[in-house]
């Protein structure tokens, strides 16, 4: 089986359906005896350029290990799902399970935001 990194962008009006989409695509991989090494929901983010007159979209990252047939099935599902604005699949040499730079940045921001609040409470 090969390793793939998949990023897909979902229409912002469909953000509440993202967990169901993730479960569906996860189920496709697991049903074909594949593995999911990393799954990250990056949330709603600004797009670099407008897509269908939209400036924000919901991002999801998956690192999977599966057969080419399973990947073709997932990409086919992306094409026929109107909520998926764009998708990108990259073949990887090995499984990647570390946090992505996007998530590392989020953790750093959260830590920086939480620290001043704690300092304010301590000084009060």
UniProtKB/Swiss-Prot annotation:
Q: Which Gene3D superfamilies match?
A: 3.30.70.60
Question: MF terms per GO, please?
Answer: small ribosomal subunit rRNA binding; structural constituent of ribosome
Which UniProt keyword terms apply here?
A: Ribonucleoprotein, Ribosomal protein, RNA-binding, rRNA-binding
Cellular component terms per the entry's GO annotation: cytosolic small ribosomal subunit
- Give yes or no: UniProt keyword Metal-binding: no
Which GO terms fall under biological process for this protein?
translation
The record, for CDD domains, names: bS6 (cd00473)
* Pfam families to which the protein is assigned, alphabetical: Ribosomal_S6
**What family classification does the UniProt entry report for this protein?**
Belongs to the bacterial ribosomal protein bS6 family.
Concerning PANTHER family, the annotation shows: MITOCHONDRIAL 28S RIBOSOMAL PROTEIN S6 (PTHR21011), SMALL RIBOSOMAL SUBUNIT PROTEIN BS6M (PTHR21011:SF1)
Q: Per its UniProt record, what NCBIfam families does this chain match?
A: S6
Describe its function: Binds together with bS18 to 16S ribosomal RNA.
By what name is this protein known?
Small ribosomal subunit protein bS6
Q: Which organism is it from?
A: Chromobacterium violaceum (strain ATCC 12472 / DSM 30191 / JCM 1249 / CCUG 213 / NBRC 12614 / NCIMB 9131 / NCTC 9757 / MK)
Q: What is the lineage of its organism?
A: Bacteria, Pseudomonadati, Pseudomonadota, Betaproteobacteria, Neisseriales
